[in-house]
């Protein structure tokens, strides 16, 4: 009877450990990045970091770490846009920021397939966003 109780307790504890969802994950601040100071700076960072992400193919442990570090700069760039744009462009920046946070968490926790899926979503959204910031006069400020 004591073995049964111990076994059931162990099972319940292990289920509890596995029941945590991704929505409860909180990122760990590993890197402090300065806020963006201009549209030109935010644009440059966004385009360069997107290019760096696009170069990642293997998504091994090293690349996942690099992706994780890239997300810090992307988060700052998107925060600048979310604060300084309006309308559709602002909404798109906010939507992309949510995906970047998902990439951040997945790469930080070495989840290769989740990271790949979130990156795919990111690249779809970022194409429209890059086109909008490239064609706007915002980058001249």
Which stretches of residues belong to each language-model region?
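Surface-exposed patches in mature extracellular/periplasmic domains of secreted proteins
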Residues: 63-64, 84-86, 115-118
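Sec-dependent signal peptide recognition
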Residues: 2-10
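Generic structural concept
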Residues: 36, 40-43, 47-50, 68-71, ...
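N-terminal signal peptide c-region/cleavage motif recognized by signal peptidases
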Residues: 14-17
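Immediate post-signal-peptide N-terminus of mature secreted/exported proteins
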Residues: 20-65, 137-141
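Short helix-adjacent coil turns
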Residues: 62, 103-114
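A charged, solvent-exposed segment within the mature domains of Sec-exported extracytoplasmic proteins
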Residues: 112-141
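Short, solvent-exposed, charged loop/turn and helix-capping segments
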Residues: 71-92, 137-140
């Amino acid at each position: 009877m004591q073995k049964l109780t111990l076994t059931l307790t162990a099972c319940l504890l292990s289920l509890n450990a596995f029941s945590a969802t991704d929505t409860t994950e909180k990122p760990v601040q590993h890197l402090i990045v300065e806020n963006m100071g201009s549209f030109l700076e935010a644009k440059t960072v966004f385009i360069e970091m997107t290019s760096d992400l696009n170069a990642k193919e293997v998504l091994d442990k090293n690349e996942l770490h690099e992706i994780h570090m890239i997300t810090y700069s992307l988060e700052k760039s998107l925060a600048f846009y979310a604060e300084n744009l309006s309308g559709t462009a602002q909404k798109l920046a906010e939507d992309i920021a949510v995906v970047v946070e998902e990439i951040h968490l997945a790469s930080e926790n070495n989840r290769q397939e989740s990271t790949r899926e979130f990156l795919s979503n990111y690249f779809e959204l970022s194409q429209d966003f890059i086109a909008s910031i490239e064609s706007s006069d915002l980058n001249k400020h």
